């Protein structure tokens, strides 16, 4: 292990994922997962060399408390003084950032201005930055924007059909998210296929509690499903995805809800959870559906049908498709979701080999389409932490 370690922080609305990455080897020295940080049941789990230890965050139910506990763990293992820089995943960087950036006060001001665009994520991201600055004074902090990868989209893909004045005044456009994941997965898929990335018309489906799909042509994002905020597009764990905007006015007029209540419902109570009335967790729903739970069955049907429609539409952006790639927690592990989705797409020449689909789970990457089939279908586990660490080291001048 070298003395050039990068701390990567990924603060969600109620979670904290942390990883200490060795700059030289790219290996994970220590990782942590803080969960339910906004509740009295907050806990943080540390993983060092495969040994896990869970600690309650009693009285520290916030991101700052979780970072403080992480600091204690680093000191316990003699890692604190080896940390040379800190990288942060930032959900929404607005129009300004097309690449990662060293964080100063001007950047913090921009991130605060983007809070209305990602109200669930940016406040948590900012909390993580402030906590890191407090606990690691003097170290450089780097922001890696989830939106930056999609700044290459053509105007026809990112423009909303609303008056120009509104678009300009409020920077009202499609931004896209999961860009850090796409930056890692796309070249990995190209490596597996043995072809230059620039020669592959690729569609990547990042499927987790949040989910999006991106069309990549000539190695660049040309279209994506998430939009002005992360709610647009696919059916997600608790987010509705695409929905008629008229729902807002209808519910405020007829259901006695205000805009904030509708927004909370569409972000936190919809998606798989809303349809199934059971869970936002795909694993739970797959088991329940097999046992005859109608809500779970319908939720998975709606999810996979919507996903297949988006895959077909992204082929327009690419001008065809050479490879479909699944990533993210669901994409990497759920053979049933992959198989059901691809079953809708045989008209595009997409097929799945049942044996390969069964094998490519739990961290295993590779091709899951038949050997004589084209386009290819792949599974590629993402590694956003490594991408963030690489950007952080480069901008912080850590060679």
From Swiss-Prot:
UniProt xrefs under Gene3D superfamilies: 3.30.420.40
GO terms for biological process, alphabetical: acetate metabolic process; acetyl-CoA biosynthetic process
Protein location: Cytoplasm
Positions with a binding annotation for ATP: 17, 206-210, 281-283, 329-333
Pfam families: Acetate_kinase
EC id: 2.7.2.1
Swiss-Prot/TrEMBL site (Transition state stabilizer) positions: 178, 239
Binding site for substrate: 89
Active site: 146 (proton donor/acceptor)
Function as written in the Swiss-Prot or TrEMBL entry: Catalyzes the formation of acetyl phosphate from acetate and ATP. Can also catalyze the reverse reaction.
Protein name: Acetate kinase 2
Organism (species): Neisseria meningitidis serogroup B (strain ATCC BAA-335 / MC58)
Source taxonomy: Bacteria, Pseudomonadati, Pseudomonadota, Betaproteobacteria, Neisseriales
